[in-house]
Amino acid sequence: MLWRNEITEFMDQLSKYSQEILKTFKQLRPSEYKQYNEFLTQVTPLLQKTPDKIPELVDHIFNYLDNVEKICELLVNASSIIISSKIREQVKHGMSFSYKADLDSLADILIQKQYVLMHLSKNIAAQYFNTCLNQGKSKLDLKAASVFYSSRPRTASSAELYRKMLYAYGSPQEINYYTEKARNKTLDVEESDSMAIIERTARHNLSLMHPLEAMGLTFGATNTDADPEDLKDKTVINLTLPQATESITYHLKSLMQLKKVSTASGLNTNILKAFDNIISTPVKKNKMASKLAPGMDVVFTSDNGKTFFTKNILSKNMLAGPKERVFAYNNLISNLNNSCFIQNHNDFLRQQDSWPFYDAHNFTNKFLMQPIFSGQTRPRLQGAMEAAHVETHLTAFLQSIQPSRPQDPSVLASPKLSALILN
């Protein structure tokens, strides 16, 4: 595919350019050869880690792009070494076959190539996200993605991840704002006054919302540092367990309102129809009481998830700011968005004697359904959910999302789709 060839060529050119500069320094500026050689030792391992041929698995492509970006940064830093026009001309002459434009400096070369890279990385990000979705995988490195877009979303791939994340909760106005913000940072464009107003509104809306609140959840978890005496009056709590159908419903309802979703995401008609069926037949929530084992510190919410209690049961803590909340929710819905979660959910439903607790401390790093203790210490939850009813719908859902025909991932790299995603 063209975008793979472009990225491979870009990496080759970076390698050749580094070697050409090194050769030029040896000839013209021996005193600075040592300095540049140290720089090259940093670049070489990154080039070696990059596969000669990009594999089919798209998560490797993100590692590939990460190497590209690191190399670009190192080359930009090294551009200060190239002082004299004589050195620039020598390097340009050595690379004239590959670079036909009139290039003044290393920075100019990188700027021209990075625009191409940004365009390609957006397509790769979209394909990566939707490959995970369609194949029932959740391999997004959310911690890295969080740093990517929260610090300075400079590239189209980070903007695309940012937009995908915002689909999970935001209004169209907020989605457009954050997408434009990422793009403006990428292109170093000043924001208008109207954008600032939208930002204030979006931040206010975010500050009122907790990731779990959108799920209708209150949760319980444990901590072994607590004194059993502190728990005398807190041994019984109410739990609202997540419903797989409602979890999927919340995330995909906003996506389905977008007319372009089937094209932009690669979801076929059967999958969209299955989601629509789940939306129209939600499972009724059930609250249940649980008696905790001694020696455990209860972590719970008292106001629909906006605040929570930690080790000191009398200490009430506000949750993190908007970015952290969005990141937590993004991770949460990613876990709910794959068949691994649904299968785990079915496995738990089949357990007749007990239910696992859910880890509220680390729900951003684990599957929501992962138990944090087992065996005799795992409490028995009374009044279990209507397991047969839930399992029937989930089984039908899994059967219905089998693709009618293999999806061609190359469609996500098309120029028309590129414009579709960003516009």
From Swiss-Prot:
Induction comment from the UniProt entry of this chain: Expressed in the late phase of the viral replicative cycle.
Keywords assigned by UniProt, alphabetized: Virion
Places the protein is found: Virion
GO cellular component, as recorded: virion component
Family affiliation: Belongs to the asfivirus E423R family.
Protein name as it appears in the record: Uncharacterized protein E423R
Organism: African swine fever virus (isolate Warthog/Namibia/Wart80/1980) (ASFV)
